[in-house]
């Protein structure tokens, strides 16, 4: 069993927020907008544009005030549909986006962390999102061809220029986080982490200890815990299903509730294009996992 402090499960998570950068309070169950693009490959505009706008409005109506997107989603169209639906972002809605990855075709995606590229990406995102300042701008992925400090330094300069409020990182390790902190305050980290894949535990713990938001991407591991997906025949799925049966929830809802209980710094950002699944995901924030539930879920293997 993993030795974590799970006391957070006693809190009503619908009322649980995290202050990104100390001054951006967001509900800890957000929305990852990536799927509101053309498919396959998240390339091109979302074909059901008006339905996508309604889904975003529904998310905000249900209490979501943190939306995550990125330049290469579309590319650009994802940011445009968010602005079309939600600008001018009343009621404390926070939109986080990313730069540092370019997409020129469905199967042509590459890191581009050159300072001049990051400035260009940021300016384009500001225009598409109809913003004067981006609340949280994240380096999407370190570019192996560019010194990491140069990429982070470009974000620091954008912050100094007032174009971004807070800086975040994505797809990084502890050493890179510490290196970035020597250049600019790091307010969020977005890495792959979910009930099945817990290899980023040291980063989760570091973020909690240092007041950094942790945004796990792939929170439902794509399968087998996504809403409507058949449960795989494995121990992870069976444990989630067993807890779900006891508390009247789906395996996917339990997986999201587990993440929220894992650390008070975690903000989960599940994505969906289905209104029913959106509601199902958001309801996960009100689940109460007992100490017995968590003990069962935390057995590895």
Locate the predicted segments by residue.
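CE4/NodB-like, metal-dependent polysaccharide N-deacetylase domain
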Residues: 117-138, 158-161
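Acidic (Asp/Glu)-rich catalytic clusters
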Residues: 21, 83-91, 127-130, 181-182, ...
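N-terminal binding-site loop/beta-alpha segment at the start of enzyme catalytic domains
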Residues: 2-93
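Beta/alpha (TIM)-barrel catalytic core signal, keyed to glycine-rich beta->alpha loops juxtaposed to Asp/Glu
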Residues: 12, 17, 142-301
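Conserved beta-strand positions
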Residues: 31, 69, 97, 136-139, ...
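Short, well-ordered coil/turn segments that N-cap beta-strands
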Residues: 25-29, 63-65, 90-93, 131-135, ...
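A short acidic, helix-capping loop that chelates divalent metal ions and anchors anionic groups
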Residues: 37-42, 102-108, 223-227, 277-280
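Short, acidic/polar
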Residues: 45-59, 113-128, 175
